[in-house]
């Protein structure tokens, strides 16, 4: 049975600042699916086996899932390097911060996120960064520009595009990623609140 964790959801009354706390909390499938269903409206099952909620100032701002078995997530891409595979990532709906998903992507591409995976690495098996695959109606996802690199694009029979992206670990902490995001997406000008 799906269920929430003991934390409120980030809403438009809360303002993020450069001093806002950032935490990725590992959760079980019931908690992850609660937020995934809430934020993305029942997408069905997922093959992710590592699930995290993103907490900003103690409020649930997003949920993200990764493959966990090293053999499954250690995927060789066109450049011959291995990347941790993001299976899904969704954020709470926000009028104040319509680009909240960009923050989630920036955070999971940071070296601080890499630290969560480093204990699984070996001298011959190291993650170069994050990879993900998206299905969409357009040949590129604007939300990923400047964060992820488009490495392949394939038109599907159903007219959707299958897009594969990678990103190397960015040399920044969660706090530095938040500050960078706030400069471009955290201002009142970006807000849809009037």
Segments predicted by a language model, with ranges:
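Contiguous surface segments at macromolecular interaction interfaces
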Residues: 1, 32-33, 163, 170-194
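Charged, low-complexity intrinsically disordered segments and flexible loops
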Residues: 1-15, 78-81, 121, 185-193
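Short amphipathic alpha-helix that is part of the acyltransferase structural core
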Residues: 2-46
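Acyl-donor binding region in acyl/amide transferases
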Residues: 26, 48, 56, 67-180
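Residues that form generic nucleotide/phosphate-binding pockets
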Residues: 35-39, 107, 181
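Short glycine-/small-residue motifs
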Residues: 62-63
């Amino acid at each position: 049975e799906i269920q929430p964790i003991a934390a409120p959801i980030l809403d438009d009354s809360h303002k993020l600042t450069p001093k806002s706390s950032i935490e990725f909390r590992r959760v079980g499938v019931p908690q992850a699916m609660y937020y995934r269903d809430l934020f993305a409206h029942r997408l069905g099952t997922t093959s992710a086996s590592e699930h995290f909620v993103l907490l900003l100032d103690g409020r649930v701002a997003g949920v993200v899932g990764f493959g966990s078995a090293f053999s499954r997530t250690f995927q060789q891409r066109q450049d011959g390097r291995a990347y941790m595979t993001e299976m899904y990532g969704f954020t709470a709906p926000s009028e104040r911060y319509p680009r909240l998903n960009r923050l989630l992507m920036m955070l999971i591409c940071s070296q601080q996120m890499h630290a969560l995976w480093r204990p699984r690495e070996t001298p011959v098996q190291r993650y170069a960064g994050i990879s993900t695959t998206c299905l969409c109606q357009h040949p590129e996802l604007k939300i990923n520009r400047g964060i992820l690199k488009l490495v392949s694009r394939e038109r599907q029979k159903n007219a959707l595009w299958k897009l594969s992206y990678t990103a190397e670990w960015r040399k920044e902490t969660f706090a530095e990623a938040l500050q960078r995001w706030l400069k471009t997406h955290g201002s009142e000008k970006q807000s849809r609140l009037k």
